[in-house]
Amino acid sequence: MRQLISPEALRAFRQSVQGSVGFVPTMGALHAGHRSLIERSRQQDDVVIVSIFVNPRQFGPQEDLSRYPQTLDADLALCEAAGVDAVFCPTAEALYPRPSDRSTGVQPPAELIQSLCGRQRPGHFQGVATVVLKLLQLVQPQRAYFGEKDAQQLRVIQRLVEDFNLPIAIVPCPTVREPDGLALSSRNRYLTFEERSQASGLYRALRAAAECFQAGSRDSQELVAAATAVLATTPAVQLEYCDCVDADSLQPLTQIPDRALLAIAARVGTARLIDNLTLQGRRPIIAIDGPAGAGKSTVTKRLAQQLGLLYLDTGAMYRAVTWLVQQQGIDPQDPIVLAELLAQADLQLRSQPAADGSEQLQVLIQGNDVTAAIRTPTVTAQVSAIAALPLVRQFLVEQQRQLGQRGGLVAEGRDIGTHVFPDAELKIFLTATNAERARRRALDLEAQGLTVDLAQLEAEIRDRDRQDSERAIAPLCKAEDAVEVLTDGLSIEAVTDQIIRLYRDRGLGDSSPQATPGQTPSPLSLG
């Protein structure tokens, strides 16, 4: 691991590395929450860079800049243990060679900084946006990782990247909590033992409001009242604000639609703590990841049918783009022409009732129903090459996320739960032993009249797993909060029923497994 002090050294390091770069900006005093960001980057990126910089321009005159925890040696040890490739530890003079009144800064949109912490900390988000833009320009990562605990900061940075057309994916990462729910924060170390015992009241307050929301309340005053009632029992917690705002614009809400951000800030002793929860009124999302041959496609389709959810056929989306490329006669290896095509593409998935009463997926692109056309041999022959293109992947992930805003779907892939739908209500990692997956593959091949060598099949499976886990685009990885389901020896029905029980146990729905009369258990096939 390299420790870099000057921007010049960082640029030299950046020019010396190849592959995708992930970036985790921090102010030091690292804890398990920071480590989760690093581990997420380590899963997805070839090179991981962490910055440690206490940014003076995001602190107000009466704030804790002078006493912010400084634990550089411990931070470097954590980074090295987590597999970080380089840590950038600049001085304030290196990043800010001129006084603030003589240097360019970033002014975030007023709508994003007038509420929540923006009211209490004037100038804070200007300082955050300025330093983040500087760091992103220096590091030039493909991805940058930020925690959802700092929800307002995250939204400001997302808008920054959008407005400046930076070719960087901002990856939101779930809040990491103590067993009693307290969100991890570098400022937690300010708390005394007694204050620490009461600080968890912040999360209990948020949960009380969330339960009120799940019970049907959509009035923001009722939700805030439910939260503040909990804090009345924690005298050490001095509430600064508790607000319901739009999850995207951060504007205050009186009535809650399908999605909102419930945010809270309080003083506990000398520590200022913040936390939040996203209130989701939409139907749940189930994200299913896993290696090839675990039965993902088969189980996902059955789950969608039994739970009344949309089966998000990501493969059909890639096929639709392939069909469009072929119809337009463009060279998919020409990134400029491909980018123009995707910018104009209108891709829609619709759920239509089938003759047997089930739901059937209809795929439209540019207004054309291509449900049947995308299954032709011509499309099949080219879809793998098209799907491997980063521009296509980026376009379709955005399309999938837009569909996910409505909820009520189940999707499968390699990184659905970690990248496409990191906020999915239920994440499943469907897997099977190599021997079981080889056996299933052998059965499929034998049904086609082919002879097979099980040892060779197992070796091929191990090699594919390695390639899928190390690939630059959409690597196979298990989400930290995913439930692993081993499918060895289980029928499709048994696996589906197990996932439905998990779905119901989480209070996501009351659907129960519905067997078709006369149906016999079906073996899992390749997914």
Swiss-Prot record:
- Which residues bind ATP per the record? 27-34, 147-150, 176, 184-187
Residues reported in the UniProt entry to bind (R)-pantoate: Q58, Q153
Reaction equation(s) it catalyzes: (R)-pantoate + beta-alanine + ATP = (R)-pantothenate + AMP + diphosphate + H(+); CMP + ATP = CDP + ADP; dCMP + ATP = dCDP + ADP
Where do the annotations place beta-alanine binding? Q58
The record's GO CC annotations read: cytosol
Keyword check for Cell cycle, yes or no. Answer: no
- Pfam families according to UniProt: Cytidylate_kin, Pantoate_ligase
Question: Where are the stretches annotated Disordered?
Answer: 507-527
Q: Provide the residue span(s) of the region labelled Pantoate--beta-alanine ligase.
A: 1-277
Query: Where is the signal peptide, in residue numbers?
Result: none
Cellular location(s): Cytoplasm
Q: Where is the active site?
A: H34 (proton donor)
Where is composition skewed (Polar residues) in this entry?
511-527
The protein's Enzyme Commission number: 6.3.2.1, 2.7.4.25
Look up the domain of life of the source: Bacteria
What PANTHER family does the record point to?
Answer: CYTIDYLATE KINASE, CYTIDYLATE KINASE/PANTOATE-BETA-ALANINE LIGASE
What task does this protein carry out? Catalyzes the condensation of pantoate with beta-alanine in an ATP-dependent reaction via a pantoyl-adenylate intermediate. Catalyzes the transfer of a phosphate group from ATP to either CMP or dCMP to form CDP or dCDP and ADP, respectively.
Please identify the protein, giving its name as recorded: Bifunctional pantoate ligase/cytidylate kinase
* Lineage of source species: Bacteria, Bacillati, Cyanobacteriota, Cyanophyceae, Synechococcales
